[in-house]
């Protein structure tokens, strides 16, 4: 049910983006409906994972302004858009690789977190990751389901399709 609702939200938003790219006319009603359905998926799961992923992590990185990113700027949606394009490129690159080997989860060290995020952000990041869900994930699942993962990635727009859509939307 939640996956279907998330897909429905995505389909509505993609259709609105295609319309905007073709006509320059924004379908605010459709975009609002897509956002509401996306929000509902989060409510149903009591978590934002249904509507956000790695692309949002990139946006949050810009918003947090860690060392070396102090001058980064952009509104959340812009950053998510850039993150989405970067993720599409990386996902397609990964899908072109042979089946990976399972590698056990290794949490980031406190020293690494402090080095990358600085004293201002490190305590919150360390606390947020105390019970990292990845520690409960069996990496063999990726190996066992690699063909299915590739198939899902191949349902994403190609890098060229995404680039054309972004250009059509003046993004």
Language model feature labels by segment:
Residues 1-52:
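Carboxylate- and glycine-rich phosphate/diphosphate-binding segment that chelates Mg2+/Mn2+
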Residues 12-21, 58-69:
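Short amphipathic alpha-helical segments and their helix-coil junctions
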Residues 15, 40, 63-67, 85-93:
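Short glycine/serine- and small hydrophobic-enriched flexible loop segments
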Residues 22-31, 48-52, 69-78, 95-103:
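Flexible, glycine/charged-enriched surface loops at secondary-structure junctions
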Residues 34, 52, 57, 63-66, ...:
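Alpha/beta-hydrolase fold catalytic core
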Residues 41-44, 65-73, 124-131, 146:
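Short, flexible active-site loops
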Residues 48-61, 76-86:
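Conserved phosphate/anionic-ligand binding catalytic regions in large, soluble enzymes, centered on
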Residues 86-171:
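Mobile late-domain/C-terminal helix-loop "cap" segments
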């Amino acid at each position: 049910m939640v996956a279907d609702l998330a897909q429905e939200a995505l389909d509505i938003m993609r259709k609105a983006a295609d319309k905007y790219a073709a006509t320059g006319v924004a379908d605010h009603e459709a975009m609002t409906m897509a956002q509401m359905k996306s929000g509902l998926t989060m409510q149903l799961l009591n978590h934002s994972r249904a509507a956000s992923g790695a692309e949002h992590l990139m946006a949050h990185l810009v918003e947090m302004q860690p060392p070396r990113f102090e001058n980064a700027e952009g509104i959340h949606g812009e950053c998510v858009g850039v993150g989405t394009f970067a993720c599409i490129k990386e996902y397609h690159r990964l899908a072109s690789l042979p089946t990976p080997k399972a590698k056990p989860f290794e949490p980031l060290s406190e020293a690494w977190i402090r080095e990358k995020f600085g004293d201002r952000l490190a305590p919150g990041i360390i606390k947020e990751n105390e019970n990292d869900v990845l520690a409960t994930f069996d990496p063999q699942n990726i190996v066992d389901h690699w063909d299915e993962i590739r198939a899902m990635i191949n349902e994403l727009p190609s890098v060229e399709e995404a680039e054309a859509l972004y250009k059509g939307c003046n993004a």
